[in-house]
Amino acid sequence: MGRKKIQITRIQDERNRQVTFTKRKFGLMKKAYELSVLCDCEIALIVFNSTNKLFQYASTDMDKVLLKYTEYNEPHESRTNNDIMEALNRKEGNQGGGNSDDESPGPSTSPVIQITMPAVVNGHSSNNSVASAASASAAAVAAAAAAVAAVEGTSSGAAAAAAALQASNAQRHHNLNLYQNLIFNPNYTRHLNQRNDPLSSTSVAPSSSSSKHLDFPPSTSFAYDTSRLHPIAAADADCDLVPSSRAAADQNIWSSALQQRPVSQPAPSISNSSTNGISNGTSSLLSPNVSSLNGHSVLDLGGPNLPYKLDPNTYVKMEPHSPPEKRPRITTEWRPQQLT
């Protein structure tokens, strides 16, 4: 059943005519605004009612738009009521009474391609669902390209486009499986390294040249044996690691070390310096006790009893793996300087 055709004639009632004018005028300005925004154009709308009242609308500025109007002598398009009536009648006859505002058919719409996303389980998508989604998207894109090319009349181009899309999607599918195996399958990297052994063997050569420049290894990279150190260095190295039960063993080490050393000269006697302005307490500190251990002179500096004794005539260098005879000892006798 066709739609009833509406006759556009003058409204006889004055009140109804004013109401219709107000509504249609606002609708006309609204359409002009939409046209100016959507199509980026300038519009000047001038309306006089039945009592010669002026109503105007301009998208930017009326004077600027009218100035552009006066600059053009020949308008690109000019229509009157008769032209519009003919267009409306022709449109209603073709479309069966349609009331669409646009005369153009609008942009052509291509078939909608719907791609199903893979289901996510516990924050991770399964390999089968991702692979099926990739293959489905590849087939859909290839079909769409073939359909568009067929519409344009290029069958050979459609086949070439479909083949290219299938090749690219196959490579993408291969890369997708590789990434998923690297992320979700820890054992995959081991097999991947076994397959890429020729590549790894070729990369060994440049790394061997750079191995010549080695930094000092950390202390945790090798076992630190203090048995070959000098006794004092060994005691310093083991001070935080050796329990109190090894105090006797340390003293035995010192005894054996002192027995292996040659007999040194006795320490020079230090005269009493109290006559030089030094108190007796200070002179007692400057005149240490000299005792003997296994036939060797040993200097006793006082204070708490240490697990070992110091030999005053022996030069000991506090460095690991460094012999005591690295630098010569000053053998000349020294005397404390007098205070003036």
UniProtKB/Swiss-Prot annotation:
A single GO BP:
positive regulation of transcription by RNA polymerase II
Which stretches are tagged as biased composition: Polar residues? 258-268
Does Transcription count among this protein's keywords? yes
Cellular compartments annotated: Nucleus
Keyword ATP-binding included in the entry's annotation: no
Entry GO terms, CC = nucleus
Q: Mention any Pfam family matching this sequence.
A: SRF-TF
Which residue ranges does the record assign to the MADS-box domain? 1-61
Residue spans with biased composition (Low complexity)?
200-211, 269-283
What PROSITE patterns does the record point to?
MADS_BOX_1 (PS00350), MADS_BOX_2 (PS50066)
Question: What InterPro entries does its record include?
Answer: MEF2-like_N (IPR033896), TF_MADSbox (IPR002100), TF_MADSbox_sf (IPR036879)
What upregulates this protein? Down-regulated by microRNA mir-1. Up-regulated in many head neurons during prolonged starvation.
* Subunit structure, as described in the record: Interacts with histone deacetylase hda-4 isoform b.
Give a short account of what the protein does. Transcription regulator. Binds specifically to the MEF2 element, 5'-[TC]TA[AT][AT][AT][AT]TA[AG]-3' in the regulatory elements of target genes, such as chemoreceptors str-1 and srh-234. Involved in transduction of sensory signals, together with egl-4, kin-29 and hda-4; binding to histone deacetylase hda-4 enables negative modulation of chemoreceptor gene expression in chemosensory neurons. In response to starvation, negatively modulates expression of chemoreceptor srh-234 in ADL sensory neurons, acting in concert with basic helix-loop-helix (bHLH) transcription factors.
Homology family: Belongs to the MEF2 family.
Protein name (database record): MEF2 transcription factor homolog
Species of origin:
Caenorhabditis elegans
